[in-house]
Protein backbone atom coordinates (compact mmCIF):
# COMPACT_ATOMS: atom_id res chain seq x y z
CA UNK A 1 0.00 0.00 0.00
CA UNK A 2 1.29 3.44 -0.89
CA UNK A 3 2.08 5.22 2.41
CA UNK A 4 1.39 8.55 0.73
CA UNK A 5 -2.32 7.82 0.46
CA UNK A 6 -4.42 10.07 2.66
CA UNK A 7 -7.43 9.15 4.80
CA UNK A 8 -9.93 9.79 2.01
CA UNK A 9 -8.07 7.55 -0.44
CA UNK A 10 -7.67 4.74 2.09
CA UNK A 11 -11.41 4.95 2.76
CA UNK A 12 -12.20 4.70 -0.96
CA UNK A 13 -9.80 1.78 -1.46
CA UNK A 14 -11.48 -0.08 1.39
CA UNK A 15 -15.06 0.71 0.37
CA UNK A 16 -14.98 0.37 -3.43
CA UNK A 17 -13.27 -2.66 -4.94
CA UNK A 18 -13.76 -1.27 -8.48
CA UNK A 19 -12.19 2.08 -7.68
CA UNK A 20 -9.39 0.67 -5.52
CA UNK A 21 -7.14 -0.50 -8.41
CA UNK A 22 -7.49 2.90 -10.08
CA UNK A 23 -6.36 4.73 -6.94
CA UNK A 24 -3.44 2.34 -6.44
CA UNK A 25 -2.34 2.87 -10.04
CA UNK A 26 -2.76 6.65 -9.88
CA UNK A 27 -0.95 7.08 -6.59
CA UNK A 28 -1.84 9.91 -4.24
CA UNK A 29 -3.71 12.86 -5.79
CA UNK A 30 -3.79 16.07 -3.78
CA UNK A 31 -7.05 17.88 -3.08
CA UNK A 32 -6.34 21.22 -1.45
CA UNK A 33 -8.84 22.68 1.02
CA UNK A 34 -7.74 26.22 0.16
CA UNK A 35 -10.59 28.23 -1.34
CA UNK A 36 -9.90 29.98 -4.65
CA UNK A 37 -11.00 33.29 -6.18
CA UNK A 38 -14.70 32.99 -7.16
CA UNK A 39 -14.50 35.17 -10.28
CA UNK A 40 -11.45 33.37 -11.66
CA UNK A 41 -13.03 29.99 -10.94
CA UNK A 42 -16.32 30.87 -12.63
CA UNK A 43 -14.52 32.07 -15.77
CA UNK A 44 -12.45 28.88 -15.89
CA UNK A 45 -15.57 26.77 -15.47
CA UNK A 46 -17.42 28.58 -18.27
CA UNK A 47 -14.46 28.16 -20.62
CA UNK A 48 -14.34 24.44 -19.79
CA UNK A 49 -17.99 23.77 -20.60
CA UNK A 50 -18.63 21.21 -23.37
CA UNK A 51 -14.98 20.92 -24.49
CA UNK A 52 -12.03 18.70 -23.65
CA UNK A 53 -9.64 19.50 -20.82
CA UNK A 54 -6.85 19.98 -23.34
CA UNK A 55 -8.86 22.45 -25.44
CA UNK A 56 -10.00 24.37 -22.37
CA UNK A 57 -6.44 24.68 -21.10
CA UNK A 58 -5.26 26.06 -24.45
CA UNK A 59 -8.04 28.68 -24.54
CA UNK A 60 -7.36 29.73 -20.94
CA UNK A 61 -3.65 30.14 -21.60
CA UNK A 62 -4.32 32.13 -24.76
CA UNK A 63 -6.69 34.56 -23.03
CA UNK A 64 -4.43 35.00 -19.99
CA UNK A 65 -1.51 35.64 -22.32
CA UNK A 66 -3.47 38.40 -24.08
CA UNK A 67 -4.30 39.98 -20.73
CA UNK A 68 -0.75 39.45 -19.43
CA UNK A 69 -2.27 37.97 -16.26
CA UNK A 70 -1.82 34.76 -14.27
CA UNK A 71 -5.47 34.61 -13.26
CA UNK A 72 -8.74 35.95 -14.63
CA UNK A 73 -9.65 39.31 -13.09
CA UNK A 74 -12.80 41.39 -13.42
CA UNK A 75 -10.80 44.42 -14.58
CA UNK A 76 -9.63 42.50 -17.66
CA UNK A 77 -13.18 41.83 -18.84
CA UNK A 78 -15.40 44.60 -17.48
CA UNK A 79 -14.84 47.06 -20.33
CA UNK A 80 -15.26 44.42 -23.05
CA UNK A 81 -18.48 43.96 -24.99
CA UNK A 82 -19.95 40.49 -25.48
CA UNK A 83 -18.61 40.59 -29.04
CA UNK A 84 -15.11 41.41 -27.81
CA UNK A 85 -15.23 38.62 -25.24
CA UNK A 86 -16.38 36.24 -27.98
CA UNK A 87 -13.37 37.27 -30.07
CA UNK A 88 -11.11 35.86 -27.37
CA UNK A 89 -11.97 32.45 -28.78
CA UNK A 90 -15.26 31.72 -27.05
CA UNK A 91 -18.77 30.91 -28.20
CA UNK A 92 -21.45 33.59 -28.06
CA UNK A 93 -23.16 31.87 -25.14
CA UNK A 94 -19.91 31.67 -23.16
CA UNK A 95 -19.24 35.34 -23.87
CA UNK A 96 -22.75 36.20 -22.62
CA UNK A 97 -22.17 34.06 -19.55
CA UNK A 98 -18.90 35.86 -18.70
CA UNK A 99 -20.64 39.21 -19.18
CA UNK A 100 -23.37 38.10 -16.78
CA UNK A 101 -20.79 36.86 -14.25
CA UNK A 102 -19.24 40.35 -14.25
CA UNK A 103 -22.65 41.99 -13.70
CA UNK A 104 -23.43 39.49 -10.93
CA UNK A 105 -20.04 40.03 -9.25
CA UNK A 106 -20.46 43.81 -9.31
CA UNK A 107 -23.61 43.50 -7.21
CA UNK A 108 -21.95 41.53 -4.41
CA UNK A 109 -20.54 43.20 -1.29
CA UNK A 110 -17.25 41.28 -1.47
CA UNK A 111 -15.62 38.44 -3.37
CA UNK A 112 -15.96 36.25 -0.26
CA UNK A 113 -19.72 36.79 -0.12
CA UNK A 114 -20.39 33.51 -1.92
CA UNK A 115 -18.53 31.54 0.78
CA UNK A 116 -20.78 32.96 3.50
CA UNK A 117 -23.87 31.33 2.00
CA UNK A 118 -25.17 27.84 2.64
CA UNK A 119 -24.66 25.35 -0.16
CA UNK A 120 -28.31 25.64 -1.22
CA UNK A 121 -28.16 29.44 -1.19
CA UNK A 122 -24.93 29.38 -3.18
CA UNK A 123 -26.46 27.06 -5.76
CA UNK A 124 -29.49 29.33 -6.16
CA UNK A 125 -27.21 32.35 -6.64
CA UNK A 126 -25.04 30.67 -9.24
CA UNK A 127 -27.93 29.19 -11.20
CA UNK A 128 -29.29 32.72 -11.63
CA UNK A 129 -26.28 33.53 -13.85
CA UNK A 130 -26.74 33.01 -17.60
CA UNK A 131 -24.96 29.88 -18.78
CA UNK A 132 -24.40 28.40 -15.32
CA UNK A 133 -26.07 25.02 -14.91
CA UNK A 134 -25.79 22.18 -12.43
CA UNK A 135 -22.45 20.89 -13.77
CA UNK A 136 -20.92 24.35 -13.39
CA UNK A 137 -22.30 24.63 -9.85
CA UNK A 138 -20.78 21.25 -8.99
CA UNK A 139 -17.38 22.26 -10.36
CA UNK A 140 -17.54 25.53 -8.41
CA UNK A 141 -18.36 23.65 -5.24
CA UNK A 142 -15.42 21.31 -5.81
CA UNK A 143 -12.70 23.65 -6.96
CA UNK A 144 -13.61 27.02 -5.47
CA UNK A 145 -15.44 26.19 -2.24
CA UNK A 146 -13.31 23.04 -1.91
CA UNK A 147 -16.18 20.85 -0.82
CA UNK A 148 -14.75 17.35 -0.33
CA UNK A 149 -18.01 15.53 -0.96
CA UNK A 150 -19.19 16.48 -4.45
CA UNK A 151 -20.05 14.19 -7.36
CA UNK A 152 -21.37 15.43 -10.70
CA UNK A 153 -23.33 12.91 -12.73
CA UNK A 154 -23.51 15.59 -15.42
CA UNK A 155 -19.79 15.21 -16.11
CA UNK A 156 -19.24 13.10 -19.24
CA UNK A 157 -15.69 12.04 -18.29
CA UNK A 158 -16.82 10.77 -14.89
CA UNK A 159 -19.61 8.78 -16.50
CA UNK A 160 -17.19 7.35 -19.05
CA UNK A 161 -14.79 6.23 -16.33
CA UNK A 162 -17.55 4.66 -14.25
CA UNK A 163 -18.92 2.85 -17.28
CA UNK A 164 -15.48 1.51 -18.21
CA UNK A 165 -14.98 0.23 -14.67
CA UNK A 166 -18.33 -1.55 -14.66
CA UNK A 167 -19.79 0.60 -11.89
CA UNK A 168 -22.94 1.15 -13.92
CA UNK A 169 -24.57 -0.46 -16.95
CA UNK A 170 -24.42 1.12 -20.39
CA UNK A 171 -28.10 2.05 -20.34
CA UNK A 172 -27.91 3.54 -16.84
CA UNK A 173 -29.60 6.89 -16.19
CA UNK A 174 -27.99 9.72 -14.22
CA UNK A 175 -29.59 8.63 -10.95
CA UNK A 176 -27.74 5.30 -11.25
CA UNK A 177 -24.43 7.19 -11.29
CA UNK A 178 -25.55 9.29 -8.33
CA UNK A 179 -26.59 6.19 -6.40
CA UNK A 180 -23.26 4.48 -7.01
CA UNK A 181 -21.37 7.55 -5.81
CA UNK A 182 -23.03 7.27 -2.39
CA UNK A 183 -20.49 4.62 -1.39
CA UNK A 184 -17.79 7.31 -1.69
CA UNK A 185 -19.48 9.53 0.89
CA UNK A 186 -17.94 11.67 2.49
CA UNK A 187 -15.08 11.71 -0.04
CA UNK A 188 -16.82 11.93 -3.40
CA UNK A 189 -14.54 14.69 -4.70
CA UNK A 190 -11.43 12.57 -4.13
CA UNK A 191 -13.06 9.73 -6.06
CA UNK A 192 -13.80 12.11 -8.93
CA UNK A 193 -10.16 13.24 -9.04
CA UNK A 194 -9.04 9.64 -9.49
CA UNK A 195 -11.65 8.91 -12.17
CA UNK A 196 -10.63 12.02 -14.12
CA UNK A 197 -6.97 11.09 -13.81
CA UNK A 198 -7.78 7.62 -15.14
CA UNK A 199 -9.46 9.09 -18.23
CA UNK A 200 -6.74 11.67 -18.87
CA UNK A 201 -3.81 9.26 -18.41
Q: Regions from the language model: what does each represent?
A:
Residues 1-30, 95-96, 100, 118-119, ...:
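C-terminal accessory module of base-excision DNA glycosylases/AP lyases that mediates lesion recognition
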Residues 18-20, 25, 52, 56-128, ...:
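Alpha-helical ds-nucleic-acid-binding substructure associated with the helix-hairpin-helix region
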Residues 30-32, 124:
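Short, solvent-exposed helix-loop connector elements
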Residues 35-40, 77:
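Short, flexible turn/loop "capping" segments at secondary-structure junctions
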Residues 38, 42-43, 55-59, 94-97, ...:
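Residue-level detector of well-ordered alpha-helical segments, enriched
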Amino acid sequence: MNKAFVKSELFLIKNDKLLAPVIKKNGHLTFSNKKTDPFNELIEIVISQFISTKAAKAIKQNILSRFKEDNFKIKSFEKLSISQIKNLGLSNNKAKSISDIIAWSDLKPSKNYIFELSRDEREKELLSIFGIGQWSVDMFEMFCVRNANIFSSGDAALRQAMLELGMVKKEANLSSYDNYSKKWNPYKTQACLHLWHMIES
